[in-house]
Amino acid sequence: MNTIHATAIIDPGVTLGDKVTIGPYTVIEDDVEIGEGTRIGPHVHIASGARIGSACRIHAGAVLATEPQDLKYAGEKTQLIVGDRTVIRECVTLNRGTKASGRTVVGSDTLVMSYVHAGHDCVIGNHVVIANSVQFGGHCEVGDYAVIGGLTGVHQFVRIGRYSMVGGIARASLDVPPFVMAGGHASFRYEGLNSLGLKRRGFTAEKISMIKDVYRIIFQSGLLLSNALEKVRTDFPAEPEIVEILRFFDSGTHGRKFLRPFNS
């Protein structure tokens, strides 16, 4: 049985799972699907095209799946997809996709804190923590278990790799590879390996040491990036983490540059 406040406005075209709670003055448009056990607070607006998973919590004032802020958008039918058990705090805005990809995605078990904005076609992974007032341009990608500090601006098309941590009040204009820390406002830089985060997630000391050695070659050897990557391919076994790092650097798009070392 669902619990819907008398002042909420729910379009007949909305599909609700069981045990959904909807608070006062919330508006949910047609072509929306909301999974079992999701709780939606007061004054929330969920526009057409939203697909919300099970056991999510959506807090007061959040605005989800509204039209993308893109001059090329011409009314195409697109989506915002949110996974299971994700928490969306107060006044978050998540735009739906454009025809470029058709959807904006936020994964499962992710925490999106207050006043975060994610633009069209962003893909945010699982178990991600996004602190207050982070602002994503369109087409950004965030890997699983990444952490992004508050008040950070993430430029359109920037990719942030898995298990990475971006410091607060940063100007994230460069791609951030997996497993590292990055930060800086005037100059966005590599700040070392996210060793503590990796340890907390069960990475062994040997694995952490190997990843650190890889990034020492990439960022601190003085080699050109292409030569550094070739040295990594030659000197290290094809462990999954090494393959992931190399694939990240090999798959850069839109001319986006990578992080630079902190002493450059």
UniProtKB/Swiss-Prot annotation:
One of its GO terms (biological process) is lipid A biosynthetic process. Keywords: Acyltransferase, Cytoplasm, Lipid A biosynthesis, Lipid biosynthesis, Lipid metabolism, Repeat, Transferase. It catalyses: a (3R)-hydroxyacyl-[ACP] + UDP-N-acetyl-alpha-D-glucosamine = a UDP-3-O-[(3R)-3-hydroxyacyl]-N-acetyl-alpha-D-glucosamine + holo-[ACP]. The keyword Electron transport does not apply. GO terms for cellular component: cytoplasm; membrane. Its EC number is 2.3.1.129. It holds the Pfam family Hexapep. Pathway: Glycolipid biosynthesis; lipid IV(A) biosynthesis; lipid IV(A) from (3R)-3-hydroxytetradecanoyl-[acyl-carrier-protein] and UDP-N-acetyl-alpha-D-glucosamine: step 1/6. Homotrimer. NCBIfam families: lipid_A_lpxA, PRK05289.1. PANTHER family: ACYL-[ACYL-CARRIER-PROTEIN]--UDP-N-ACETYLGLUCOSAMINE O-ACYLTRANSFERASE, ACYL-[ACYL-CARRIER-PROTEIN]--UDP-N-ACETYLGLUCOSAMINE O-ACYLTRANSFERASE, MITOCHONDRIAL-RELATED. This is Acyl-[acyl-carrier-protein]--UDP-N-acetylglucosamine O-acyltransferase. It comes from Chlorobium phaeobacteroides (strain DSM 266 / SMG 266 / 2430). The lineage of its organism: Bacteria, Pseudomonadati, Chlorobiota, Chlorobiia, Chlorobiales. The gene is lpxA.
